[in-house]
Regions:
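C-terminal capping/lid segments that line or modulate ligand- or cofactor-binding pockets
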Residues: 12, 24-78, 402-428, 560-564, ...
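Aromatic-rich carbohydrate-recognition surfaces in CAZymes
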Residues: 154-156, 179, 188, 271-280, ...
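Well-ordered alpha-helical scaffold segments within catalytic/enzyme domains
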Residues: 152-154, 294-303, 316-321, 360-374, ...
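An extended acidic
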Residues: 25-125, 195-213, 284, 288-304, ...
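Acidic/His metal-coordination segments adjacent to aromatic residues that form catalytic metal sites
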Residues: 337-348, 399-416, 464-488, 557-567, ...
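Extended ligand-binding clefts on enzyme/binding-domain cores
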Residues: 174, 188-212, 302-310, 398-410, ...
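Acidic/polar, glycine-enriched structural segments that form the non-catalytic walls/loops
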Residues: 23-31, 128-133, 141-350, 372, ...
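Active-site acid/base region of carbohydrate-active enzymes
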Residues: 301-331, 380-402, 423-491, 521, ...
Length: 771
């Protein structure tokens, strides 16, 4: 929902007065309205210098509440900055961006229809008392490790004095930094990570101080020019009588000299030239060129309801959120969920990491756009996160894919999720059938990656990695797609069946007919037992006949308790509704009019259920006719804000019974895909059916996006207290924005509508089970 953000976190004066209650060091607010990085062209499928975009820039930035927030340099998860705000001294007192301003996010470079052409932003923060306006233009230098911010301060009620307040989090932590300040630069470093902030005009005053009790504003009174620990760097800009523009560059490097020289070089190159290179204007190769390479973009625009604005933003977001050292390493989000209450004293990736499931969604969406290079790079990357003899600490069976890992393949979470082992096979088959993955290469990957994965989906094995010593017996998964429960999961099993069927095709192409037969036979076995394992006929809701979210044993009618998670008390499995069964239709395992599928929809869509169990919610938006559907992950989901206090999920490292997972835009896209499959049972859907899908599901996802065209992980459902952030119903929460999967689902829905058939459907699976 695109609204001007107007809530007040706290005034500058209040922040000073209450700083003693603040956490000493955290990350920033996670509802980003913008993220960006330079477009870098591959050289032989890798990121290295010498290609048409020259040197490789490895800097990413994010924006929230009008403020520059987490900025990464090096690997995509290596944050070096928490935030940079501007404090303004006025005749009537102090004001600080975020607390005392409203914020508006716009794209700096758009086409004639207003569609974004690059992830460069114009951020306008306006003082609530009408004393000043600040405009920031933010982008990176595509030829250097530098961030460029053009700042224009306009005084409206007398002269004002702006001061940059930079909070470094060098080496991805909020402590242990060394900082220094002078008239010419603000600098910080920890380990081998260095930054240097330079401005186009010398600082009138500059200081480096230690953050005390979370009070960054205290730096305005500091006089020291060096500090160590959790630090704040302050640089006072010249007084502004009317309107002044300052260019600010933050350079990064492996040592102080490199960072300083980088900042100076970018500043010397200048705003216009750096921006032109970033955008790809004229002879420069940049973001314009990437968008122009997307062969399907023009026709997908026609399937949108906003003229293609969110589509082009989604294309940018998917490509931005790729590492620039490990080509094809697609992460979940450039955010740390509920970051403003997450302890930053220890390094953490947040969502800036690889989950093969999210990764698959992104690669498939990029393929849907007609990007032939990134999905192939992604496929080539996958052995990096497959468990085998070379996985650090592994002494168990391999073939499965890590639950979550750093982009360099370092294991972070080691649960076994069978859908994450199936999806790499599904991606490989898709790229092969598109004609992008040659037969010879497919056969090579069959031996080294795809066959071990398919074998694990058949036989499972004994895991021995870190804490995990489980014996896996497919299709029973140790964790389903929400990483919380073990059992028979409709969504997981849908992917496993699809993965095995297409693995049969790949094995046959590789000459391994014995394995091909085994994979198909096993898929048939799993498919034949779906309803017996996962459909209850004695459920609590509706007529009692529906798919379970998960069954922890072989009997779907015994009301076994689901394990307690996220602060929630255990409930019987039949009381936990979700839409995971729709994945059976998406992949072709069941027809859209399958009796068990149809029987499960009334319970899923029942808006009369009490909020604890209810999954579907309808939303209205100001000035927009109609209501629009959204769904939670499942009933009794605790992955969200506390309904009693409004506190963030997991605040103070505590799980609370009042926590509640909200509505995820992903599921609006998933339902749109189901409705498309239903409309196409007898052939291509008719125009009226397609129009309804666009006006309902496509439009809803567009409305869930914020003014920066970022689609959140979760949107506020209006249930319970919201004292912390004053969310508007249908607005993104502090969980994670942009979520790459949300953008991927939107793109895939447009491709599916444009094609008149589900993009993620697998023809051999459908031919086998859903004719």
């Amino acid at each position: 929902m695109r609204t001007l953000k107007t809530f007040a976190l706290a005034s500058a004066a209040t922040l000073i007065a209450t700083a003693a209650q603040a956490a000493p060091t955290t990350w920033a607010y996670s509802a980003k309205t913008g993220v960006g990085a330079s477009y870098e062209a591959y050289v032989d499928g890798a990121y290295k210098a010498g290609g048409k975009t020259g040197a490789v820039s490895k800097v990413w930035f994010s924006i929230a509440d009008g403020v520059l927030t987490e900025t990464m340099y090096g690997l995509i998860h290596e944050a070096q900055i928490k935030q940079m705000r501007i404090a303004v001294e006025t005749a009537s007192g102090l004001a600080i961006e975020g607390a005392d301003t409203t914020a508006k996010t716009e794209y700096l470079h758009v086409d004639a229809a207003g569609r974004p052409l690059s992830p460069a932003y114009k951020i306008t923060t306006t003082d609530r008392q009408g004393r000043f306006v600040i405009e920031k233009r933010i982008f990176t230098d595509p030829d250097r490790n530098a961030l460029f911010v053009r700042v224009t301060v306009t005084a409206l009620k007398g002269a004002v004095t702006p001061t940059l307040l930079l909070e470094p989090h060098m080496a991805n932590t909020g402590g242990g930094d060394m900082g220094a300040a002078s008239a010419s630069a603000l600098t910080a470093h920890e380990g081998k990570a260095f930054l240097s902030l330079k401005a186009s005009k010398p600082f009138a005053k500059a200081s480096a101080s230690v953050l005390k009790d979370g009070d960054a504003l205290a730096a305005l009174k500091a006089t020291a020019t060096s500090a160590k620990g959790a630090i704040v760097l302050a640089g006072e800009l010249p007084k502004v009588a009317k309107s002044e523009t300052f260019d600010v560059v933050i350079g990064f490097g492996a040592d102080a000299k490199a960072a300083d020289q980088t900042a100076a070089a970018t500043l010397k190159t200048g705003y216009a030239e750096v921006l032109a290179r970033y955008n790809g204007e004229g002879a420069h190769v940049g973001w314009e060129d990437y968008l122009a390479s997307l062969s399907q973009l023009p026709r997908l625009r026609d399937a949108s309801e906003d003229g293609g604005k969110l589509l082009q933003a989604s294309a940018l977001m998917l490509k931005v959120q790729e590492d620039r050292t490990y080509a094809g390493a697609l992460i979940a989000s450039l955010s740390n969920p509920w970051g403003d209450t997450v302890d930053a004293t220890k390094s953490s990736t947040g969502y800036k990491a690889v989950w093969p499931r999210d990764f698959y969604q992104c690669a498939m969406a990029l393929a849907a756009l007609g990007d032939k290079e990134t999905p192939l790079a992604a496929f080539h990357y996958l052995p990096t996160v497959q468990v085998g003899p070379k996985t650090p600490g592994n002494t168990g069976d391999g073939g499965w894919f890590l639950q979550k890992s750093h982009v360099d393949g370092t294991p972070e979470w080691v649960g076994v999720q069978l859908d994450q082992t199936a999806m790499p096979i599904m991606l490989g088959w898709k790229l092969w059938k598109l004609g992008w993955l040659p037969d010879a290469e497919l056969k090579a990957f069959y031996g080294k990656m795809l066959k071990p994965a398919a074998d694990f989906l058949v036989k499972g094995g004994k895991v021995n990695l870190d804490w995990n010593t489980a014996t896996i017996t497919p299709p029973f998964t140790q964790q389903e797609r929400w990483e919380e429960q073990g059992g028979h999961s409709p969504s997981t099993t849908a992917a496993v069946i699809a993965g095995l069927v297409v693995a049969g095709d790949i094995a046959e192409a590789a000459g391994d007919t014995g394995s091909a037969a085994l994979y198909r036979q096993t898929a048939d076995d799993y498919a034949g037992k779906l309803e017996a394992r996962m459909v209850t006929t004695k459920g609590t809701f509706g007529d009692g006949h529906y798919y379970l979210r998960l069954n922890s044993d072989q009997d779907p009618n015994n009301k076994s308790p689901v394990e307690a998670r996220n602060g929630q008390a255990p409930v019987a499995e039949d009381k936990m509704l979700d839409a995971g069964f729709l994945e059976l239709v998406r992949y072709g395992v069941r027809r859209a009019d399958d009796p068990a599928i149809l029987a499960s929809l009334p319970e899923l869509d029942d808006e009369a259920l009490e909020d604890l169990y209810r999954v579907r919610y309808s939303f209205k938006f100001p000035g927009v006719e109609g209501s629009f559907p959204g769904w939670r992950r499942y009933g009794v989901d605790g992955y969200g804000e506390d309904t009693q206090s409004g506190a963030n999920y997991g605040a103070n490292n505590q799980m609370r019974p009042g926590q509640r997972g909200r509505v995820w835009p992903i599921f609006t896209g998933e339902r749109g895909h189901y409705e498309l499959a239903l409309a196409g049972l007898s052939g291509k859907p008719d125009p009226a059916a397609l129009a309804k899908i666009r006006q309902t599901y496509v439009k809803a996802m567009e409305l869930f996006a914020n003014d920066g065209l970022m689609i959140p992980e979760q949107v506020w459902d209006g249930v319970g207290a919201d004292s912390a952030h004053a969310y508007v119903r249908g607005e993104g929460t502090d969980s994670a924005t942009p979520l790459a999967w949300s953008h991927a689902e939107y793109v895939k829905l447009l491709r599916s509508v444009s094609d008149g058939q589900v993009w993620d459907n697998y023809a051999p699976v459908k031919a086998r089970y859903a004719r």
